[in-house]
């Protein structure tokens, strides 16, 4: 174990007792949820109704190749929205991946982001949206309540069941040099709205559907035995 890692671990253990009171004191926004077949298209319609005119779709190349992104792009175009697609997101997004997404959003002058994909795509979109407004690097955003200004408006369409990132305050980023994953945690990261569309999940490979289903179960068990539950945690865990 390196001395730097040991020091970080010691610091986290010192701060851990503060987590519960902080988590109870900070209000967590609840996104509007569109649920059911074609919920993703209803979400796209709502983006136009919110008045956003330049939307960046943040996703990965696999989903573009599978044809899952194009109907969403067309739904936005039909509302007269200027749409760009950034498909450079990779699993466990690293600082360079996030920087590339940030530069794409800046070049397009996006006024909103639509995240399409699994946890990595949604987490990346959260951090990119925060970077676009704050100008901070991913490393400067790591930790609790460091986003500062409200980020670019974010909408999320998960294509797997395993993440939950579409309703959470956190995003996980990877330092490619230290090979360390860290979390950006801030209520400002919660999307304005999210779509839970079973038709999109049906289009995913069977192995991905099975693996992310187990991931969802793991999250439910984790939250159920968590020592810092919120009022509705148990209800959602049992339902899952």
Residue spans for each PLM region:
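Short beta->alpha junction loops
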Residues: 85-95
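An N-terminal, well-structured beta->alpha segment
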Residues: 1-85
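Predominant activation on well-ordered alpha-helical scaffold segments within soluble catalytic domains
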Residues: 44, 73, 84, 99-102, ...
């Amino acid at each position: 174990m390196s001395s730097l890692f040991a020091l970080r671990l010691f610091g986290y253990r010192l701060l851990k007792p503060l987590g519960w009171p902080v988590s109870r004191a900070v209000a967590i926004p609840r996104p509007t949820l569109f649920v059911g077949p074609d919920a993703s298209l209803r979400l796209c319609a709502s983006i136009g109704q919110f008045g956003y005119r330049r939307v960046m779709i943040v996703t990965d190349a696999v989903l573009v190749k599978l044809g899952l992104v194009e109907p969403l792009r067309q739904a936005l175009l039909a509302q007269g929205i200027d749409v760009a697609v950034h498909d450079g997101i990779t699993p466990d997004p690293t600082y360079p991946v996030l920087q590339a997404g940030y530069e794409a959003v800046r070049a397009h002058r996006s006024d909103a982001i639509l995240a399409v994909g699994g946890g990595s795509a949604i987490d990346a979109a959260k951090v990119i949206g925060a970077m676009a407004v704050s100008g901070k690097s991913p490393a400067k955003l790591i930790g609790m309540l460091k986003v500062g200004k409200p980020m670019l408006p974010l909408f999320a369409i998960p294509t797997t069941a395993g993440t939950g990132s579409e309703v959470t305050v956190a995003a996980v980023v990877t330092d490619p040099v230290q090979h360390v994953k860290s979390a950006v945690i801030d209520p400002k990261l919660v999307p304005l709205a999210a779509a839970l569309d079973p038709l999109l999940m049906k289009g995913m490979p069977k192995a991905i559907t099975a693996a992310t289903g187990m991931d969802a179960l793991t999250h439910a068990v984790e939250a159920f035995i968590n020592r810092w539950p919120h009022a509705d945690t148990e209800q959602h865990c049992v339902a899952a």
